[in-house]
Structures are given as C-alpha cells and as structure tokens.
C-alpha cells in the first residue's frame, strides 16, 4: 500500500511538472481512476483507454467515470451503447490484442520446431495459462497440476512470464510431469491441442 501511494504521488508530481493538455490513462482502474480524479481537480482533461468493466461488476463506478473522465476509448463494441445510456461519451477503438496477435502469427514457429526447441515429445500438448500474478499462480496452478495427472497421454506445458521467478511455478508443479516454458505464451498456444486458461486477458488471447 505504501508503494502504491508513493507511485501515485510520483505520477502526480510528474504530470504537474509536465503540465499536459490531457492525461491518457490506460486500463488499471484501481490506480488510474484515482489519477483521473486528481487530474480533473487540477484542470487537466482526461482520456481513458480500456474502460473499467463496470458492466460486469461494481457498476456504481459509472458515476466516477462520468465525473472524472472526459473521453472514454473502449475495446468492446457493445460498450458504446452501454456508456451512451449512462451519459458518457465513448469511442470504439478496438482491442490492441488483435493487432498484436496478428503481427506475431506469421513469426510463430511450427509445432514441430516448438517441441524441439523446448525438449518436448510427440504427445499432444495442453497449454496451462495459470495467470500473470503471484496470487493467480498460487490459486490456479495446483489445480492444473492435479488435472495433468489424469491425462498421461498428453503433455502439459505451463506458460510462464519473466517477471515471476521460475521457482514460484515449480513450487506448485512438484511431483507432476508439467513442463515450464517462459515468455512463449503465443508459441505454446499455437502448438497446443487445448488450453486451460485463467479467466482474464489470456482468455481473449
């Protein structure tokens, strides 16, 4: 909590020193809605990209978007009407994942090359996307590890991320045959027959 408060203060100081015409906030509503409020209180126009998912939960946050956000840039088409009905100007920009995935599609290795690169055998692959935060790994990977025991004819590959230490994953993979690869999420998905995915951005990917 102290770290977040310090980062908030540093952001506010940097924005004040720069004195921008507008502040563009991207996702992360727990932090950025507080920044939006601060910006409005200091006469700075606010533009918010990737709207908080108020249509799914904690809908009361709509009133804060209405008060503190001048322009909302949205990634889902249905959000346009939703926010319009709430009196909020929203412009559909689409999801950046579409472009990111399309750009990667042509550079992905073949399933055979992926297997060879990561020392995998010829059994069908099931990708495990347990999340990108410590808490998600803790909550999801143990269940995924137990699942792997029920399907010995498949090889399970957990897609890790570089900002979480490999030992965090290994802690929950002990005694299982799960393989670990790092920063190869798209490659792993492309080579897999199926995937077990923690709900979130990875589901859309």
Task: Tell me the role of every PLM-derived stretch.
Residues 1-118, 129-140, 150-153, 161-163:
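Active-site and donor-binding regions of nucleotide-sugar-utilizing enzymes
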Residues 18, 67, 121, 176, ...:
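Structured loop/turn residues at beta-strand edges in well-structured enzyme cores
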Residues 21-22, 125, 194:
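Structural motif
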Residues 80-87, 167-175, 205:
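Short loop/helix-cap segments at secondary-structure boundaries that form the rim of catalytic
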Residues 125-126, 155:
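Residues that mark the start of a beta-strand
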Residues 134-193:
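Donor-nucleotide binding loops and adjacent catalytic segments primarily
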Residues 186, 204-205:
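Short alpha-helical segment that forms part of, or immediately flanks, the ligand-binding pocket
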Residues 190-203:
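Acidic donor-binding loop of glycosyltransferase active sites
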């Amino acid at each position: 909590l102290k770290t977040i408060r310090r980062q908030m203060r540093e952001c506010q100081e940097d924005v004040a020193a720069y004195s921008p015409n507008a502040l563009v906030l991207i996702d992360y509503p727990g932090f950025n809605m507080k920044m939006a409020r601060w910006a409005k209180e200091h006469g700075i126009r606010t533009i918010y990209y990737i709207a908080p998912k108020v249509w799914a939960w904690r809908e009361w946050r709509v009133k804060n978007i209405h008060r503190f956000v001048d322009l909302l840039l949205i990634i889902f088409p249905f959000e346009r009407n939703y926010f319009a009905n709430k009196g909020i100007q929203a412009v559909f920009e689409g999801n950046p994942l579409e472009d990111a995935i399309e750009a990667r599609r042509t550079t992905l290795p073949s399933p055979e090359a992926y297997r060879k690169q990561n020392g995998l055998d010829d059994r069908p692959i099931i990708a495990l996307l347990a999340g990108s935060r410590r808490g998600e790994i803790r909550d999801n990977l143990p269940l995924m590890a137990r699942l792997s025991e029920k399907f010995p004819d498949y090889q399970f590959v957990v897609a890790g991320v570089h900002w979480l230490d490999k030992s965090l994953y290994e802690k929950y993979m002990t005694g299982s045959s799960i393989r670990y690869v790092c920063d190869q999420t798209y490659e792993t998905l492309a080579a897999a027959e199926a995937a077990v995915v923690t709900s979130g951005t990875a589901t859309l990917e």
